[in-house]
Amino acid sequence: MNCISDFFTYETTKSVVVKSWTIGIINRVVQLLIISYFVGWVFLHEKAYQVRDTAIESSVVTKVKGSGLYANRVMDVSDYVTPPQGTSVFVIITKMIVTENQMQGFCPESEEKYRCVSDSQCGPERLPGGGILTGRCVNYSSVLRTCEIQGWCPTEVDTVETPIMMEAENFTIFIKNSIRFPLFNFEKGNLLPNLTARDMKTCRFHPDKDPFCPILRVGDVVKFAGQDFAKLARTGGVLGIKIGWVCDLDKAWDQCIPKYSFTRLDSVSEKSSVSPGYNFRFAKYYKMENGSEYRTLLKAFGIRFDVLVYGNAGKFNIIPTIISSVAAFTSVGVGTVLCDIILLNFLKGADQYKAKKFEEVNETTLKIAALTNPVYPSDQTTAEKQSTDSGAFSIGH
């Protein structure tokens, strides 16, 4: 019966005015902190009154310009940039190991790890190298024997030191970026309206002096990413050119501007002694008059650039404004909860506050009160009109 009786109960708030400087100051300070948080952080910094679009649509077109001297050859864009289509990911080759006149046939491996003394050491359990192992141990030189392979011969010797193309430091990268926020049908590009054809010939990007120039010098990008060009060109690496679009669409159209930043994306592999840097292989194929095919194999070291576009846009909307405002007003009540905890447990006179704060009224109490002090509806109406009592208890200290 007690469980049923407890279930069918009703609780209502009771207003108790506590005249205490201590608890009053705590209450106002907590309320001030909560209001300051919502006004300063939630509304002004996080712009909780806006609806945001994070599904940015973007396209990137790149173009590299410059010529360099490598191995007594003048190299232009067609020689050192891959892929040539001008995508958001491209490589500028800075060093190459060239193996010329390779033809299909049988030849000894060139790597030291394929050293052998007898055919038994060239079985299928050995890791494959530049071709398919034949199982024979043959002479590589007068002092070295290695396992024989079937494939493109002669095999590559990638341990030789080759120079780097230092002219690449002064190459330029032109970036054309277009973005769109579909929720607001807002479009813009990094080629700002005040940019002229003359500017395109002379300007170079600088975060302070010219932050909106779309032409970047390779050496500057490497420096802004905190890298050394000579070291990076020798081993290769991956750099990120990040373009950020964080736009407040409640402001003017020209206030939505790109922000460039630079970083090294493969910094983990940079510290590895097993496979530092970035390199890849490709081949150029030719045919002799008799129809035989041969090729030139190139192991290329270079700087890979990844143009990464990110961003979001916000605009005023009544729904998030109402939700955030309600959350702010509701959170002010946290001060009341904190003050109640202090009053009930820590302040002098806590027992008196508990007696006024929590009062239990049952049906028996109501019947006794009605018999001892009957109130008729007409008298009650008169009393309500003349009463100035707010219904609140006041506790003074």
UniProtKB/Swiss-Prot annotation:
<dbReference type="GO" id="GO:0050909">
    <property type="term" value="P:sensory perception of taste"/>
</dbReference>
<comment type="function">
    <text>Extracellular ATP-activated non-selective cation channel. Plays particularly important role in sensory neurons where its activation is critical for gustatory, nociceptive responses, visceral reflexes and sensory hypersensitization.</text>
</comment>
<feature type="disulfide bond">
    <location>
        <begin position="203"/>
        <end position="213"/>
    </location>
</feature>
<dbReference type="GO" id="GO:0098686">
    <property type="term" value="C:hippocampal mossy fiber to CA3 synapse"/>
</dbReference>
<keyword id="KW-0325">Glycoprotein</keyword>
<protein>
    <recommendedName>
        <fullName>P2X purinoceptor 3</fullName>
    </recommendedName>
</protein>
<dbReference type="InterPro" id="IPR003046">
    <property type="entry name" value="P2X3_purnocptor"/>
</dbReference>
<feature type="disulfide bond">
    <location>
        <begin position="107"/>
        <end position="153"/>
    </location>
</feature>
<dbReference type="GO" id="GO:0014832">
    <property type="term" value="P:urinary bladder smooth muscle contraction"/>
</dbReference>
<keyword id="KW-0407">Ion channel</keyword>
<keyword id="KW-0547">Nucleotide-binding</keyword>
<keyword id="KW-0406">Ion transport</keyword>
<comment type="subunit">
    <text>Homotrimer. Forms heterotrimer with P2RX2. Heterotrimeric P2RX2/3 has a ligand dose-response profile that is distinct from either homotrimeric P2RX2 or P2RX3.</text>
</comment>
<dbReference type="InterPro" id="IPR027309">
    <property type="entry name" value="P2X_extracellular_dom_sf"/>
</dbReference>
<feature type="topological domain" description="Cytoplasmic">
    <location>
        <begin position="342"/>
        <end position="397"/>
    </location>
</feature>
<keyword id="KW-0472">Membrane</keyword>
<feature type="region of interest" description="Disordered">
    <location>
        <begin position="378"/>
        <end position="397"/>
    </location>
</feature>
<dbReference type="GO" id="GO:0010524">
    <property type="term" value="P:positive regulation of calcium ion transport into cytosol"/>
</dbReference>
<feature type="binding site">
    <location>
        <position position="63"/>
    </location>
    <ligand>
        <name>ATP</name>
    </ligand>
</feature>
<dbReference type="GO" id="GO:0098794">
    <property type="term" value="C:postsynapse"/>
</dbReference>
<feature type="glycosylation site" description="N-linked (GlcNAc...) asparagine">
    <location>
        <position position="194"/>
    </location>
</feature>
<keyword id="KW-0812">Transmembrane</keyword>
<dbReference type="GO" id="GO:0071318">
    <property type="term" value="P:cellular response to ATP"/>
</dbReference>
<feature type="transmembrane region" description="Helical; Name=1">
    <location>
        <begin position="21"/>
        <end position="43"/>
    </location>
</feature>
<keyword id="KW-1015">Disulfide bond</keyword>
<feature type="binding site">
    <location>
        <position position="281"/>
    </location>
    <ligand>
        <name>ATP</name>
    </ligand>
</feature>
<dbReference type="GO" id="GO:0030424">
    <property type="term" value="C:axon"/>
</dbReference>
<feature type="glycosylation site" description="N-linked (GlcNAc...) asparagine">
    <location>
        <position position="139"/>
    </location>
</feature>
<feature type="binding site">
    <location>
        <position position="65"/>
    </location>
    <ligand>
        <name>ATP</name>
    </ligand>
</feature>
<feature type="binding site">
    <location>
        <position position="158"/>
    </location>
    <ligand>
        <name>Mg(2+)</name>
    </ligand>
</feature>
<feature type="transmembrane region" description="Helical; Name=2">
    <location>
        <begin position="323"/>
        <end position="341"/>
    </location>
</feature>
<dbReference type="GO" id="GO:0070207">
    <property type="term" value="P:protein homotrimerization"/>
</dbReference>
<dbReference type="Pfam" id="PF00864">
    <property type="entry name" value="P2X_receptor"/>
</dbReference>
<dbReference type="GO" id="GO:0001666">
    <property type="term" value="P:response to hypoxia"/>
</dbReference>
<keyword id="KW-0106">Calcium</keyword>
<dbReference type="GO" id="GO:0048266">
    <property type="term" value="P:behavioral response to pain"/>
</dbReference>
<dbReference type="GO" id="GO:0005524">
    <property type="term" value="F:ATP binding"/>
</dbReference>
<feature type="binding site">
    <location>
        <position position="299"/>
    </location>
    <ligand>
        <name>ATP</name>
    </ligand>
</feature>
<feature type="binding site">
    <location>
        <position position="279"/>
    </location>
    <ligand>
        <name>ATP</name>
    </ligand>
</feature>
<keyword id="KW-1003">Cell membrane</keyword>
<feature type="binding site">
    <location>
        <position position="275"/>
    </location>
    <ligand>
        <name>ATP</name>
    </ligand>
</feature>
<keyword id="KW-0675">Receptor</keyword>
